[in-house]
């Protein structure tokens, strides 16, 4: 069983992380629409490279936001802190470090070895 204080701390961190990610995504969106277009070929190339970097950063932030939302959902359902691989409680230190994690250290090792076998 996960300590209720750990769950509360994780929930607070997740809510703060969600807010930060949403603000950053909004800022990226504004920057995208405010960018300058036109210019010579070199300017257009730099612009395309910057757009690509922004797109990749937004994808990462959206993925992280999804993980945060899923973790908050698990808190509401009462399944937060249970490893998806082993069905055992995730270590409190790990949850405090990575509150959106779905795997214990053991579960992460199992999943990693399975992924390596598939590759």
Predicted regions and their residues:
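Short metal-coordination and nucleic-acid-contact micro-motifs, chiefly zinc-binding Cys/His arrays
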Residues: 76-80, 100
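Interaction interfaces in information-processing and related assembly proteins
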Residues: 1-77, 112-119
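Short Cys/His-rich "knuckle" micro-motifs
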Residues: 93-98
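Cysteine-rich micro-motifs
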Residues: 99-108
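Short acidic/histidine-centered micro-motifs embedded in hydrophobic/aromatic stretches
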Residues: 31, 85, 89
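Amphipathic alpha-helical recognition patches that constitute DNA-binding helices
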Residues: 9, 85, 99
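Short functional micro-motifs and their immediate structural scaffolds
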Residues: 89-91, 112
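Short cysteine-rich clusters marking metal-coordination/redox-active sites
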Residues: 83-86, 104
């Amino acid at each position: 069983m996960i300590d209720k204080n750990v769950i509360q701390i994780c929930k607070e961190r997740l809510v703060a992380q969600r807010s930060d990610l949403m603000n950053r995504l909004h800022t990226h969106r504004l920057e995208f629409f405010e960018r300058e277009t036109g210019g010579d070929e070199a300017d257009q190339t730099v612009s395309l490279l910057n757009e690509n970097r922004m797109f990749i950063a937004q994808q990462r932030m959206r993925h992280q936001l999804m993980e945060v939302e899923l973790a908050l959902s698990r808190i509401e359902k009462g399944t937060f802190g249970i490893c998806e691989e082993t069905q055992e409680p995730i270590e409190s230190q790990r949850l405090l470090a990575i509150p959106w994690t779905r795997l214990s250290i053991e579960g992460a090792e199992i999943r990693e070895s399975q992924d390596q076998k598939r590759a």
